[in-house]
A protein has these predicted regions:
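Short, low-complexity N-terminal intrinsically disordered segments enriched in polar/charged residues
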Residues: 1-12, 16, 117-126
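A contiguous, mid-protein "functional segment" used to position or interact
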Residues: 77-108
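Short, surface-exposed coil-to-beta transition loops
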Residues: 48-51, 65, 78-84
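Low-complexity, intrinsically disordered terminal/linker segments enriched in charged
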Residues: 98-126
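A solvent-exposed, acidic/Ser-Thr-rich amphipathic alpha-helical stretch
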Residues: 7-60
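Short, cysteine-centered beta-strand-loop-beta hairpins and adjacent loop/turn segments enriched
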Residues: 43-44, 69-79
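A short hydrophobic beta-strand element
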Residues: 59-68
């Protein structure tokens, strides 16, 4: 859906009253707002990769680990690893989805000292 920039079934996947929270703060509290966000976002950027690495499912909950990369119309690229916590209804629709992001640019702050040496760089938004 995101890769193709087409709504291929939001109505069939999500409940009317879903709660969808992005890793950096935005919260969409119903399906119509989620559809608006999807359509509006796709005017500003393109998802290049959204690969599922693994998932764990139990009862009505799923945890999904994924890798994400996009290119915005400004020319900026964003990429990060993420996890989604998904809660399902009895009729297999998503009623809650919460994203968490993880920076790909990892390092050991204790590599050269017992005192942490943090990089002087902009911290990602998640």
């Amino acid at each position: 859906m995101w890769i193709n920039q087409q709504d291929l079934g939001i109505d069939n996947i999500f409940t009317d009253d879903l709660i969808y929270i992005e890793s950096w703060g935005p919260k969409y509290e119903n399906r119509e707002l989620l559809k608006h966000w999807f359509n509006e976002w796709n005017t500003r950027g393109k998802v290049l990769i959204w690969d599922i690495k693994q998932f764990f499912h139990k009862d009505n909950q799923t945890i999904v680990e994924w890798y994400f990369k996009n290119k915005m119309n400004t020319g900026n690229f964003e990429e990060f690893d993420g996890i989604s916590l998904v809660v399902w209804t009895k009729d297999n629709k998503i009623k809650e989805l919460k994203e968490f992001g993880c920076n790909l640019n990892n390092y050991n702050p204790y590599e050269e000292s017992d005192i942490p040496q943090f990089r002087d760089e902009k911290v990602n938004w998640f």
